[in-house]
């Protein structure tokens, strides 16, 4: 098939054939890594890692992905360590980055910032999270994780639990799941419900959606996607304190499930996912992080036009 996505900015850009192609290529990359044959695919290429908002997993995952492909990385972390702190615009920053690197990965607290970045340059740009907007590479690795863990997506029931209002990983993954025959449970307090714009975007697709405040809905789900309450997005800290502990996933809840509920979490976790879940075989969130490296290795290659 013809895959034509130099930039990875949001999940709306991907069709079902695109996703089928990506899943297949990630499988190929996973085998290459297992056989120690991936190193050297991007030799001579330079990645600019631009993280203007806190990150551990995504930043290290992208940098590890580039290094494992034989490429190199230059980076900046936080506004205080960049010329943006001096008043430089994101546009100007990107024009400078274009002179140094072959591809850029950017995380920024402002929704839509990745589009500004991509519009400024000719090199590929990958969105690693833009405020409460989207996190497309996380969604792709989440999709791959579910398929790897469950064998399929069609026919599954997936629960999203926690902060559905500000959770960009949820926004992105739901956009991808509309291409599959799935049933969604949205489990959150009303104050943190999925924005109406995302619900409307699901209309006309074959999935079904149900909203509830009952955490026990997890018992009927094949997958439980848990997220932390996004403290940094709340304009009112008292509101965060009131809501932060309303939904908690623990071992007792998961063991009571009618299905072998696979537990996912984009991490970091705070109080919403108990550590007593970690030793369950269906706790997949650390495997999820591992799938992230091969997924991002694949996306880096495809954005740079390098087949494998």
From Swiss-Prot:
| SUPFAM superfamilies given in the database record | Aspartate/ornithine carbamoyltransferase (SSF53671)
Q: Which residues bind carbamoyl phosphate?
A: 57-58, 107, 135, 138, 267-268
Molecular functions (GO terms): amino acid binding; aspartate carbamoyltransferase activity
Which GO BP annotation is one of this protein's? Answer: 'de novo' UMP biosynthetic process
Domain of life of the source: Bacteria
Q: Does the keyword Transferase apply?
A: yes
Q: What is its EC number?
A: 2.1.3.2
In this chain, L-aspartate is annotated as bound at 86, 168, 228
Gene Ontology CC: one annotated term:
cytoplasm
> Which pathway is this protein assigned to?
Pyrimidine metabolism; UMP biosynthesis via de novo pathway; (S)-dihydroorotate from bicarbonate: step 2/3
Q: Which reaction does it catalyse?
A: carbamoyl phosphate + L-aspartate = N-carbamoyl-L-aspartate + phosphate + H(+)
User: Which key words are in the record?
Assistant: Pyrimidine biosynthesis, Transferase
Cite the InterPro entries for this sequence: Asp/Orn_carbamoyltranf_P-bd, Asp/Orn_carbamoylTrfase, Asp/Orn_carbamoylTrfase_sf, Asp_carbamoyltransf, Asp_carbamoyltransf_Asp/Orn-bd
What's its job? Catalyzes the condensation of carbamoyl phosphate and aspartate to form carbamoyl aspartate and inorganic phosphate, the committed step in the de novo pyrimidine nucleotide biosynthesis pathway.
**Belongs to which family?**
Belongs to the aspartate/ornithine carbamoyltransferase superfamily. ATCase family.
Stated name of the protein: Aspartate carbamoyltransferase catalytic subunit
Taxonomic classification = Bacteria, Pseudomonadati, Spirochaetota, Spirochaetia, Leptospirales
């Amino acid at each position: 098939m013809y895959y034509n996505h130099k930039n990875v900015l949001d999940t709306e850009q991907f069709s079902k054939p695109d996703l089928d192609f990506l899943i297949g290529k990630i499988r190929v990359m996973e085998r290459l890594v297992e056989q120690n044959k991936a190193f050297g695919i991007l030799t001579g290429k330079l990645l600019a890692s631009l993280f203007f908002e806190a990150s551990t997993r995504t930043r290290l995952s992208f940098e590890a992905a580039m290094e494992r492909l034989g490429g190199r990385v230059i980076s900046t972390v936080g506004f205080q360590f960049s010329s943006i702190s001096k008043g430089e615009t994101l546009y100007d920053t990107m024009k400078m980055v274009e002179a140094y690197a072959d591809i850029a990965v950017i995380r920024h607290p402002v929704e839509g910032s990745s589009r500004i970045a991509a519009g400024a340059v000719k090199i590929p740009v990958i969105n690693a999270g833009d405020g409460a907007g989207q996190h497309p590479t996380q969604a792709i690795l989440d999709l791959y994780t579910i398929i790897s863990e469950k064998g399929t997506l069609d026919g599954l029931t997936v629960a999203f639990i926690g902060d559905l209002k500000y959770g960009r990983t949820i926004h992105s993954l739901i956009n991808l799941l509309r291409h599959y025959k799935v049933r969604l449970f949205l489990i959150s307090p009303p104050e943190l419900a999925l924005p109406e714009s995302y619900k409307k975007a699901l209309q006309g697709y074959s999935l079904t959606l149900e909203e509830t405040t009952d955490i026990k809905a997890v018992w009927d789900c094949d997958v439980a996607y848990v997220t932390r309450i996004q403290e940094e997005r709340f304009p009112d800290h008292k509101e965060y304190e009131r809501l932060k502990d309303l939904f908690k996933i623990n071992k007792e809840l998961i063991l009571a499930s009618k299905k072998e509920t696979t537990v996912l979490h984009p991490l970091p976790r705070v109080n919403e996912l108990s550590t007593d879940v970690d030793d369950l075989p269906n706790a997949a969130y650390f495997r999820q992080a591992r799938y992230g490296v091969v997924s991002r290795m694949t996306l880096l290659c495809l954005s740079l036009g390098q087949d494998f």
